[in-house]
């Protein structure tokens, strides 16, 4: 079977399974199966697949048809122009989270020597990206999951990003009295009440504790905010990714913060909140 024939067959199966973005999935998984780039697929469409390549592609397509995210099948996802390892132990990095990185870039000069904490680091995409974009930052990252931290540590090592990692339930492992110049987080913020609106591949395959934040999506955030306040220096910044339905409740929780603002994503949906701890 040629590359084109294999692609066309896979596309039909993915469409029949009502897979989101079937053409993209077919391409990504064919590149994965052949260990090639997209240009290769278009340059050699009549090239015959080997038996091993065909078997690998068939298995990948079958997994995708059952809802498994393509990123878990390939083990990779791009974030802010860098390749990150992913596994079912971590939330898949999303383009929306890049708005948090952009918000940090708007606040901080590249040469700052700030101490920064990433809470709930998951794959480490935020922490490692900040360490690369701000080489003088001292970045610490925490997560409750040891399995997630293994992925995060591997990503930092691959990218040569200097990050200190700790297992921690929110900020519980941070020393009393230790304070940071900035704390960032992409906490679980989807409400259980919204579960019927969440894609099957997210509900069935991504870590539940990294997606859902209680009935209304606020349980973790309500615990997180006072801990962040305690561990931020006066004048320090807090940036957090949020969902479209919780901007107002988050604003209420952060009513004592200054410089509060909500940063929308490209669709105009509230995506990142920014607040500053008063200097006095």
Swiss-Prot record:
Q: Which family does it belong to?
A: Belongs to the protein N5-glutamine methyltransferase family. PrmC subfamily.
* Name of the protein in question: Release factor glutamine methyltransferase
Function as written in the Swiss-Prot or TrEMBL entry: Methylates the class 1 translation termination release factors RF1/PrfA and RF2/PrfB on the glutamine residue of the universally conserved GGQ motif.
Annotated GO molecular function terms are: nucleic acid binding; protein-(glutamine-N5) methyltransferase activity; protein-glutamine N-methyltransferase activity
Q: Where does substrate bind?
A: 186-189
EC numbers: 2.1.1.297
GO BP terms: methylation
